[in-house]
Amino acid sequence: MHVTLVEINVHDDKVEQFIDVFRQNHLGSIKEPGNLRFDVLQDPQVPTRFYIYEAYVDEQAVAFHKTTPHYKTCVEQLEPLMTGPRTKKVFMGLMP
């Protein structure tokens, strides 16, 4: 299992817009073949910080995800909302 944890920080006045933009990516991603989980998490201590927990069966499923229209649109629309670049950490899932 291929797991990615993405951290995204957005401007104070862009929180609701971020949620709207990411909702479309979430809805498309959970329908993809090979997707096991796609959670959008908001930090209760820092409401402008979000984490995306993505689990796919393998790297090929992740590669496919990055070709989808919902992913490409989301990435494009995120740029002006973020305070800096996204950070990603990749994990190998052992015990889901």
From Swiss-Prot:
It is found in: Cytoplasm. Residues 2-91 form the ABM domain. It holds the Pfam family ABM. InterPro entries: ABM_dom, AI-2_Isomerase_LsrG, Dimeric_a/b-barrel, LsrG. One of its GO terms (cellular component) is cytosol. Keywords: Cytoplasm, Isomerase. GO terms for molecular function: (4S)-4-hydroxy-5-phosphonooxypentane-2,3-dione isomerase activity; oxidoreductase activity. The keyword Cytoplasm applies. It catalyses: (2S)-2-hydroxy-3,4-dioxopentyl phosphate = 3-hydroxy-2,4-dioxopentyl phosphate. Its EC number is 5.3.1.32. Homodimer. Involved in the degradation of phospho-AI-2, thereby terminating induction of the lsr operon and closing the AI-2 signaling cycle. Catalyzes the conversion of (4S)-4-hydroxy-5-phosphonooxypentane-2,3-dione (P-DPD) to 3-hydroxy-5-phosphonooxypentane-2,4-dione (P-HPD). Belongs to the LsrG family. This is (4S)-4-hydroxy-5-phosphonooxypentane-2,3-dione isomerase.
